[in-house]
Amino acid sequence: MRQITVQFTSFRDIREFSVLAARQPFQITVGTEKYKVNATSFLGFFTLNCRRPLIAQFDCSEEDYARFLEEAAYFLVK
């Protein structure tokens, strides 16, 4: 299981990340230690506190991981 930390600054960011997650050949969950939602569920994000960094978790190959990190670079917490 891989995980990255992401953060969103607007509804548009959430929508774009949700669309990005839907294009992946693997499932992505986003949330906190306590609450997790499917990253393709735009409405699911509204059950989370998106003002704070969130953890995105997924299980994928090394190639898919590298490609996803490139595509999701804007959302990564540095």
List the predicted regions and their residue ranges.
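A generic secondary-structure micro-motif detector
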Residues: 7, 31-32
